[in-house]
Every structure is written in structure tokens, then in C-alpha cells.
């Protein structure tokens, strides 16, 4: 099962920017790829979105979609514990989301709850066993939670080809 592109790409971009800012200028790896003005504008927009979604949640506390959008927004703001809490609320409201909730695994990873992240990616494999990106996240989580040796032993096996660059990355 493929993830919706509009959610996957922004989450990947934010994950990369949050974990290790990349530089457009190789000569200055400390320079952030986005201007300070652009970062402030994005942060302000996300903060406003959190306020609006919080009000919507007060009005309709059982709407899973509001928690989903607010959790994503908290993730973009690098407020990973709040992101996890909203993803957890989604699962509380709709138990069917538990297995398929890969975003919760990424939020747990950045919240430094590596065991929970590894578990989420493990159960996600039962939902979608051809998603090599999930296997990479699981490996990262297991390496942080249990060590590199156990993570290597726990590598998921894939029988079906996946989109590049994931097969190549997985071979590393």
C-alpha cells in the first residue's frame, strides 16, 4: 500500500531538516538550506495551524482528521512528544489505525522513544510488507534501542522490488 504523496514528501523533508540540516553550500555545512525569513514564515504558519486545529478539536473532539493534521503540524514544529500524543489519540479514537500508523513510528523516533518506534515499524510491516522505507526506519530504531548487532539481525526481508533509492540504501 502506498502512502499519500502529499503527506509523505513533507514528512520526509522535515525529518531530514530536523535530524541533520543539509547545506546547499558544501563549503559551509553549518548554513541552513532555508533562509531565516522562510523558516520564521513556515514556523508562524504552523503555529497558527495548531491554534486553529486546537479550536476545531474543542468543537469536535472525536474527529480523527483534526488530530492527524495537528500531529503532523507538531511534527513540523519539532514538538515530537505532542505529535506522538495526537497520533496516539487518533489510534484511541480509531483502533484500526494502530497497525498502519507509520507516522507515529517516525514521531516516536524523533521523540527518542526508539523501542516504541521499532515496534511501530514492526507492526506496520504486517500491514504493508513491501515498504522498504519502513524497514530502514525500523533498522534505525532498533539500532538506537538495542544496538547495531540486534538491528542487523532483525532486518526485514523483502521479496518484491521497491522504488529507488530504497533497495540500494537497504543493502548498506
Which residues does each predicted region cover?
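N-terminal leader/linker segments that initiate helical-solenoid repeat arrays
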Residues: 24-65, 69, 76
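Start-of-helix register in tetratricopeptide repeats
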Residues: 65, 99, 133-135, 140
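Register position in tetratricopeptide repeats
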Residues: 76, 110-111, 144
Amino acid at each position: 500500500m502506498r502512502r499519500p504523496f502529499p503527506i509523505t514528501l513533507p514528512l520526509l523533508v522535515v525529518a531530514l531538516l530536523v535530524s541533520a540540516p543539509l547545506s546547499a553550500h558544501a563549503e559551509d555545512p553549518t548554513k541552513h538550506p532555508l533562509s531565516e525569513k522562510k523558516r520564521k514564515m513556515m514556523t508562524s504558519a504552523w503555529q497558527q495551524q495548531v491554534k486553529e486545529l486546537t479550536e476545531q478539536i474543542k468543537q469536535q473532539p472525536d474527529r480523527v482528521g483534526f488530530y492527524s493534521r495537528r500531529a503532523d503540524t507538531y511534527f513540523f514544529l519539532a514538538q515530537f512528544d505532542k505529535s506522538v500524543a495526537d497520533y496516539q489519540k487518533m489510534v484511541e479514537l480509531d483502533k484500526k489505525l494502530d497497525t498502519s500508523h507509520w507516522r507515529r513510528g517516525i514521531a516516536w523516533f524523533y521523540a527518542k522513544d526508539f523501542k516504541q518506534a521499532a515496534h511501530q515499524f514492526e507492526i506496520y510491516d504486517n500491514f504493508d510488507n513491501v515498504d522498504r522505507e519502513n524497514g530502514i526506519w525500523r533498522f534505525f530504531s532498533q539500532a538506537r534501542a538495542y544496538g547495531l548487532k540486534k538491528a542487523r539481525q532483525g532486518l526485514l526481508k523483502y521479496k518484491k522490488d521497491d522504488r529507488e533509492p530504497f533497495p540500494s540504501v537497504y543493502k548498506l
